């Protein structure tokens, strides 16, 4: 037997899923996250799931991990002290930045500008200059450059970024400075912009490379520690890390380019959602991943997640390929509060996290959270995670009652209903960002819900968006780990090539794209993926001449082989531009960047359809419970999901429980069990 182990570390829980490839049998575990050292929670989960499966850790063939280490380093300001080497005259590139201030009309008054990840006192200039076409204008001055590097060594930097003007067109100067840095700053990790982001725009290229340096020591330490701990537990399987774009990369390479891991965790959920939605027969859908701290949403079209060229974490926005995920601070642990000034109920973004957690957990938490509201409303059973977490209903009522008192409501139930309504609206706003604001009508999509808290709110989100059916995969609380275990190895090559359509031809574009594909394929082959099992996807960034931004246009292999490449690109660009902005221009089109992603094969995981059982779900009925719905109490059936069979129809109001999550079916709706074991919720 061959086992694949998927691991996803969240803000509250660490999810582990063990998958036996030949039968599709899964074993799962959910353990509290350990923020001080994430590897502790990971190892606890692995030990637990191996014991459940009755296997030795040495039988695991692959370990596939979605991590938030890089993300947390950015959010918590725990990154390295970064030194930055720039071209003479560009020392303040990070301070000048871009003329964008968030927060509306008066944002510039109240917005606290974040400090750059590389301080000005740790930024030096070197003499030497390249032109935009890569030709040398001024040669490097070795003596001056070494003196500047020695200055950084004396400043005690922990990581070094080298970002020189126009290095995307010629990396010779950056490589030379890196060679000198290796002798002047031994042991210091070095990131050069022509490798991290070989594209135009010096600010974005510099910022992205500095971010890579900022998180590199932290990620490297974590990967080394986890690798060593796995070895000590008898797991000799290779460790792979999930990239932000949903592909896997070997741990050593991930440590070299950690900026590609900033959305590693959310990408795993989207990848898992694609797998289960395909089994249920849906390829166009929105994803809704609600955990304990935050909610991530994305859009999938034709079975492919939309990929963005910007990754945003907190105030930091870097140019890195990632699944186009939007995040809001709304989770099961989000704290409800009533500001003294406005007396208006708010929910989040503050979270009770894993420690102390919601009041219902009985770990000392006293503030009212979304989880407490669901407990008060009767939507959550008395125990979570298969009975491992008991809920304190009285503590939840006491916590939520403080909200009722603060805003003058008559009962904790009314306050709890208000908390749930507000958090649902917050998440609805995030879903609009990836659908309506991108030119898509959510009513044309299904909605795939997962995460520990997602299925509790999924039916309500379906009602708000009009996206039907709402699909709740099996084991939704560990779906991110399932995505980690069912995705493929991936690599990417990119290049800036600024050409007006009239200044290039099909042959030049085809040659450049082929070179990028060859480069990425070679790196994938080095990781053990046979060439015949590799597939390439092509993307070209286009704009009208004079525009200050580009639109990525996907290009399939058949179009690349056809003789009318520019016409195909132009037509696709016009379609996308009109969808986004509702107009076209007569300006000439212009090629800006080329990008090729090469992927290995998806794992061949067996699928076993669920046994047929007819429409009657009564064999899975465990009990009934009073739930507060539509302003009054109603009787709801409590169902054990493990006992539901294909074809069963659960009519709301109902609560469907399982080890890692709970699904709420509202009045006037019904959940049909699909043969893939997913629940399909729709209005009756």
Model-derived features: positions:
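C-terminal, non-catalytic interaction/recognition modules in large multi-subunit enzymes and RNPs
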Residues: 4, 9, 143-154, 282, ...
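Terminal amphipathic helices with adjacent charged low-complexity linkers/tails
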Residues: 159, 163-209, 213, 555-559, ...
């Amino acid at each position: 037997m061959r086992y694949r182990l998927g691991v996803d570390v969240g803000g509250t829980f660490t999810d582990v899923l063990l998958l036996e490839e030949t039968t599709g049998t899964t074993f799962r575990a959910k353990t509290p996250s350990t923020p001080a050292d994430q590897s502790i929670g990971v190892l606890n989960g692995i030990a637990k799931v191996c014991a459940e499966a009755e296997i030795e850790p040495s039988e695991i063939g692959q370990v596939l991990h979605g991590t938030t280490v890089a993300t947390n380093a950015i959010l918590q300001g725990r990154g390295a002290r970064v030194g930055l080497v720039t071209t003479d005259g560009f020392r303040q590139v990070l301070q000048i930045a871009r003329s964008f201030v968030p927060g509306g009309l008066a944002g510039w008054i109240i917005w606290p500008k974040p400090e750059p990840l590389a301080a000005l006192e740790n930024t030096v200039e070197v003499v030497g200059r390249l032109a935009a076409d890569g030709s040398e204008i001024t040669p490097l001055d070795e003596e001056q450059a070494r003196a500047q590097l020695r200055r950084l060594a004396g400043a005690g930097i922990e990581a070094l970024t080298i970002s020189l003007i126009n290095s995307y067109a010629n990396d010779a100067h950056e490589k030379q400075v890196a060679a000198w840095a290796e002798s002047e700053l031994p042991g210091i990790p070095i990131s050069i912009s022509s490798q991290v982001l070989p594209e135009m725009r010096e600010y974005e290229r510099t910022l992205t490379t500095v971010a890579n340096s900022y998180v590199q020591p932290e990620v490297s330490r974590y990967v080394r520690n986890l690798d060593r701990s796995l070895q000590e537990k008898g797991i000799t399987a290779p460790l792979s890390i999930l990239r932000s774009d949903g592909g896997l990369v070997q741990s050593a390479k991930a440590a070299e380019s950690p900026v590609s891991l900033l959305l590693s965790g959310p990408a795993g959920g989207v990848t898992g959602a694609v797998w289960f939605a395909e089994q249920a027969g849906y390829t166009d859908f929105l994803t809704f991943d609600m955990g304990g701290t935050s909610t991530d949403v994305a859009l999938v079209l034709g079975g492919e997640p939309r990929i963005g060229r910007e990754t945003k974490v907190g105030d930091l926005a870097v140019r890195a390929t990632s699944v186009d995920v939007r995040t809001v601070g709304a989770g099961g642990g989000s704290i409800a509060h009533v500001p003294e000034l406005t007396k208006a109920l708010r929910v989040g973004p503050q979270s009770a996290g894993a420690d102390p957690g919601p009041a219902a957990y009985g770990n000392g938490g006293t503030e009212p959270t979304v989880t407490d509201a669901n407990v008060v409303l009767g939507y959550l059973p008395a125990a979570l995670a298969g009975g491992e977490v008991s809920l304190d209903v009285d503590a939840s009522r006491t916590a939520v009652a403080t909200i009722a008192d603060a805003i003058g409501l008559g009962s904790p139930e009314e306050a709890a209903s208000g908390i749930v309504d507000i958090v649902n609206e917050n998440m609805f706003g995030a879903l609009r960002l990836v659908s309506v604001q991108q030119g898509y009508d959510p009513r044309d999509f299904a909605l795939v819900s997962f995460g520990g808290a997602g299925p509790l709110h999924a039916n309500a989100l379906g009602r708000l968006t009009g996206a039907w059916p709402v699909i709740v995969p099996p084991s939704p609380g560990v779906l991110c780990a399932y995505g980690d275990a069912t995705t493929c190895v991936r690599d990417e090559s990119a290049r800036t090539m600024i050409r007006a359509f009239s200044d290039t031809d099909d042959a030049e574009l085809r040659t450049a794209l082929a070179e990028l594909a060859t480069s990425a394929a070679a790196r994938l082959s080095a990781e053990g993926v046979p060439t015949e099992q590799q597939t390439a996807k092509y993307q070209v960034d286009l704009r009208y001449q004079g525009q200050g931004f580009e639109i990525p246009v996907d290009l399939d292999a058949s179009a690349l082989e056809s003789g009318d490449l520019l016409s195909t690109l132009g037509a696709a660009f016009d379609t996308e531009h009109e969808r986004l902005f509702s107009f076209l221009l007569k300006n000439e089109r212009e090629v800006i960047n080329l990008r090729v992603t090469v992927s290995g094969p998806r794992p061949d995981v067996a699928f076993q359809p669920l046994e047929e059982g007819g429409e009657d779900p009564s064999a899975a009925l465990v009990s009934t419970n009073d739930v507060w719905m539509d302003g009054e109490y109603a009787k709801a059936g409590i169902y054990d999901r493990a006992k539901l069979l294909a074809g069963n129809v659960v009519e709301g109001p109902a609560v469907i429980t399982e080890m890692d999550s709970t699904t709420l079916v509202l009045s006037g709706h019904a959940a049909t069990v699909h043969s893939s074991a997913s629940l399909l919720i729709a209005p009756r």
